[in-house]
Amino acid sequence: MYSQQELDDAVAAGVISAEAAAALRAHVEGQRSIAIPDEEQFRLITGFNDIFVSIAAAILLFAVGFIGQSLGEAAGLTLDFKGPSPLAPPAVAATSWALALFFTAKRRMALPSIILLLTFVGGVLATTGFSLAMAVGTDALNHNNAIGGIIVAASAAVAAGAAWLHWRRFRVPITVAAGAASVSAVAIGLLVAVVGPDDKNLENIILGFLLVLGVATFLFAMWWDGSDRSRLTRRSDVAFWLHLLAAPMIVHPIFTLLGLNNGTASLSEGLVVILLYVALGVTALAIDRRALLVSALAYVLYALNELFRQFGAVELNVALTALVIGSALLMLSAFWHQARSAIVRPLPEGLRDRLPIVDRTTPIPATQPAG
């Protein structure tokens, strides 16, 4: 790509005319802002070097963790005999932070940054959990199951703090979702400690609470989305990861609490699954996020499979299910923008103003791919 100064020098040297230079500038500016429907772009890989660095970082972190575990075993710092050592995860977390200082802060590499963030927060979580478990003792854990919930909550709280520190230093979009997941784990851990692990209704209570947390995460994601309705900044990437977290937290409890996840779906239950999936599809179109559809895909595949089986297509039920769902999703993908316009435009203006803009412009840099 030629710079502005090089174009001016070419005009001064008589290589091209001033009119041609102006036309070239206008053409490039036009290419940088082409009106296309958003395709939920997010930056993950800019080249094979991202994959190369990610593989190398994973190998290094595995080695560091293995060495930490070996040192812990030699020093007798393990949970039970040959159990996990609290020396391994802090070594992984510290190494992840050190690597992020270069590959995230300086090189701005997307995929390695995501991996290093997850290993850092995971390392802090494991360090706190293993340390508290060792301090309490395995006997106390075995005789008082509520302590386990408290340890989970405390560990997740420290992990949430670590995610906040990482966000303050590196601003990796997925960090906010990692922090939200940690806060959710704190809430669930405290719930288990209060209700008691031996309660017969604990599973349903957790599922209901998880649904509430999922809705809260979804609303948090919508707040980030609402602050960047044109999806031009990092805030949109933050919202993407939050939606990816919220989707299974919403979908799994709904289908499980309705009894649609027990392997014995009836015809009516299968129809309920399909209707719920359609409702999720309308919501996904309205907010312009595909995560809800992906999270519920396994449930609707199972439901359609059961419907085809009950209608007598036993041998072809799997193939017919894949054919119907695959065709429907491809059709939706091809006409996503048109379908979204049909759903969003009739909405009240107050609600429409909170959703991503329908006809927005996605900027495309002239020298590199968008994302």
PLM feature spans:
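Alpha-helical multi-pass membrane segments and their bilayer interfacial helix-loop junctions
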Residues: M1-G371
